[in-house]
Amino acid sequence: FRDCPPETLPEGKPHRFGGWSLLTAAVAGVTLATGLMAVYLYALPQDDALLTAVGGVTPLVTFHRGDCTVAPENTLPAFRSAILKGGDRIELDVQMTSDGVVVVTHDSNLKRCTGKNAKVYDLTYAEVAQLDAGRWFSSRFADTRIPTLEQVLQLCRGRIGLNVEIKPSAATPALEAETVRLLREYGFDSSNCVITSQSYETLHKVKALAPEYPTGYILALGVGNYYDLPDADFFSVETTFITSGMVNAVHLRGKTVSAWTIDREKVATHMLELGVDDLITDKPDMVQDLLARNQQVDDSLIDFRD
């Protein structure tokens, strides 16, 4: 996947887990059927991960900065791998260079991933394009570059959804508008793209520019009365602060909850139990395997019903 061109990647999503449908199959008040189902459940392997959230809706699987355990984060190889593995979305981070080019990278200072001790907004795109964003990860990815948002959109269009986190700066006031312009130009809309930020002001700007995009407020703590914020359609919350009460309060308002960053099966299982809508993960293989096992349980229950 390191070098495969976009045209060799599959169109559309190669894999998606179906919805869990036990709840729709339940018939209220039928005592015998309920008892038989309980007996059948008891006979299944007693794996907590297999018995969670039965009757709910399968959450999305979002690859955090692409498939970042097999390729350098926020690079085209990481995004290609996410596409090939059938992710629902890629979470990526956008910033702007000094000459107005939107690039995909997480840290405002480029030292960690490139060795260059400089801020993104202090460099031109030509300067950013010279940096090696892959060697730190593995010599196999030497000479991998920081991609532009346009390059990422060309790769991902029609193949995977996006969660675009805008990282604003006082030095780049045009970042929101240019990001929206590019998303629209490449056909990303409310069906395949959401926009997130830790800055509520940024979400307000996005809603004014493009009200059609779902916007997510990223919360490190997830405390306080934020449920009714008008410019936040969903909330992206660190897993430690997600509770059943919080999820219920958000759902009652017609909004959703994304959980980050899920790297352990125990945590993923707990998020399923709480009814979280989107699992943002650095370990997508683990999360997809967990959901597949849940799906097998649901399919067995459907077979039993029929």
Regions inferred by a protein language model and the residue ranges of each:
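Selective recognition of hydrophobic, aromatic-rich stretches within alpha-helical transmembrane segments
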Residues: 1-4
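Phosphate-group recognition and catalysis centered on beta-loop-alpha active-site segments
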Residues: 6-306
